[in-house]
C-alpha cells in the first residue's frame, strides 16, 4: 500500500505548485516554464525569496493533505467501503486530477495549440533586420530604455482604461497623458500581449529584436549556444553606430540568459546586482527582495 500513499503525497505536491502558479505567478504559461527550466538556473534569487516560496507552498500542501486524507479516514472510521480498494482507486484518480489541473494552470493546452497552429505572419510581415537599412542622423541622440517589471495599465484609472476608480500609478499615468504612448485600444492599453513576450526575458528580446525568444527545453542558452545569434537587434545597430552601451539592473543578469543576450548583441557593459557589489555601489550584504530596489537603482544609474 505504500505506493499509493506515495501517489497521495505526489498529488499534494502537484496541488501545491498548481496553487502557487494560480495565485502568485498568475499568468505563467508553459512557454515561460520551459524557458526558465532551460535558462533560469543562475541568479534565481536569494535564500530569503526561496524560503518565502517554500512557505507559501508548504501552507497549501498541509491544507490539501488534510483535505485529501479526510475521505480515507471517513471510509476507515465508518467502514463504508473496502479500505484498500478505495485507497487504490482514490489515489490514482487524485493523481490524474492534480496532474491535469497543474498542466491546465501552466496553460499546456495553449502551448500545444500554438505549437500545432500554422501561420504566415513571417512570410507576410516579418522584416529581416540583417537586410533592413538603418541610417543614423548626423547628430546622434542619447537613448535610454527603462523596463518596468510587473507593471501594467490595469493599475491606472478607469477613465483612461484601467481597472481602478483612483489610479494606483498617478505619476506614470501623467507621463502617458503628456507623451506619445502606444495602445491596442482607444485608451491607454499598451500593446497586445502575445504568449512568448509575456515574461521578462521574452519581453526584453521581442522589444529589442522584433523576434520571439527561442524556447527549447533541452537546449538552454550558453556561450556555445548564443541567444538569437543570426538576428540583428537594437543593440547591434547601436553598436555599429558607436554607441556606448550599458545594461543596468538590480538583479543578477545571469538569470534567464540576460547577460548572454546583451553581451552578444551590442557587447553591453553589464552593471547588475553582482557588479554593483564589486564596484562598491552597494554593501556586500545589501539585498532588497531580488537585489536592488528601483529608487536606489536610479541613484546608481
Predicted regions located by residue number:
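Transmembrane and membrane-interface helices of multi-pass
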Residues: 1-114
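Soluble catalytic regions of membrane-associated enzymes that act on cell-envelope
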Residues: 90, 101, 105-301
